[in-house]
Amino acid sequence: QRASNAPYVVTEVDPGSGALLARNCYAAEFSRRVAFLDCSERQRSFTCDRLEFLGRNGSQADPLCMDRARLSGRVGAGLDPCLAMQVMVDLADGQSRELVFSFGSGMDLTDARTLIHRFQGVGAARAALAGVWAYWNRTLGAVHVRTPEPSLDFLANGWLVYQTLAARMWGRSGFYQSGGAFGFRDQLQDAMALVHAEPALLRQQIVRSAGRQFREGDVQHWWHPPMGRGVRTRISDDYLWLPYAVSRYVGALADTGVLDERAPFLEGRPVKPDEESYYDLPLASEETATIYEHCVR
C-alpha cells in the first residue's frame, strides 16, 4: 500500500548516528514506530526521495542513482519516500573491504537509536550474525530423520521447521495469503510442529490463543496484533485446536503446569443469524480462566 501511505511518511537524518529515519504518524497502531537505515561507512550520501533514486519512469533494475556521483540528501515530508544510501569504495587489485548496512524498525525513536548503536560497525554485525547461525543450528538440529527418500530427508531435516518458524509463526505469511494475522487454528497447528524444536513457543501460542476466546466459548478465527482486531465467525473446528494443542504439548513435555496458566476472555456481540462473520475490535473481559477451563468452555 505504498501509494496510500506515501503522503504520511516523514523522513529525517538522526543527528547522533547519521542514520536515516522514517515514521508514519497516521498509522494508528504503529504511529510511534521508527524505521531506520544505517551504514558502517561514515562517508556516504543519501536520499529519501524514491523519484530521485529511480529516476522518472526508472526501475529497480536500472536506477538513475547508479549514474550519479552523489545523492542530494533530500529528506522530509511530501516525497515518494524511501531510504537510500550511496557509499563510494575504491579498491586496489586484490583488496577487499567489509561494509555493513543495518535496516530495521524500533518501537519508538529511543528504541530505534538503541538498535542503531547496538549494530554499528563490522564487529557488532559479525557477532549478531554468529548468534543467528548458532540459533538456527540449534533449532533446526533438534529433530533429525533418515528415510529411504533423500528429498524427504532434506525437507524434514531443517527446511520445514525453518519455514514453519520464520514464515508461519514470525511472518504469519503463506503462499496464498500474506496478511500478518494470527489464526486461532492455523498458528496452533504451526506451533505444534515445533514441539521438539521450540516447545516454549508452543506454550506461548497456547496461552495467546486462549486469550482470544469469547466468554461464550467461540473464538476469533484470526486477529491482527497489537490491537487485536479480527473476525468472529461460525467456523466450528476452531473449538478443537486449543485442547488438541494442549494435549500435544503436555504429552510431549509432561509440563502440566500449562493447564494452570490463566488467560482472559473477550467480550463482543454474537454473530447475527444472517451473518457468517463480522470484523471488529473486541473488548477484554475482566473474567479470566485457566487454560484447562478455556479448553472445556
Regions found by a protein language model. Give the residues of each.
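Polysaccharide-binding surfaces and accessory modules of carbohydrate-active proteins
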Residues: Q1-R68, M85, T110-A142, R269-P273, ...
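Active-site-adjacent bridging/hinge elements
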Residues: A69-L79, G158-R172, S209-W223
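Beta-strand-rich interaction surfaces with strong enrichment in secreted/lumenal proteins
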Residues: S72-G76, Q86-L91
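Short Pro-Gly-centered flexible turn/kink motifs
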Residues: V89-M107
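Low-complexity, Ser/Thr/Pro/Gly-enriched N-terminal "stalk/linker" regions
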Residues: A130-Q177, Q204, R208
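Solvent-exposed loop and edge beta-strand segments that line ligand/cofactor-binding
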Residues: S173-Q187, M227-D237
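Aromatic-rich carbohydrate-recognition surfaces in CAZymes
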Residues: L194-L202, I206-R297
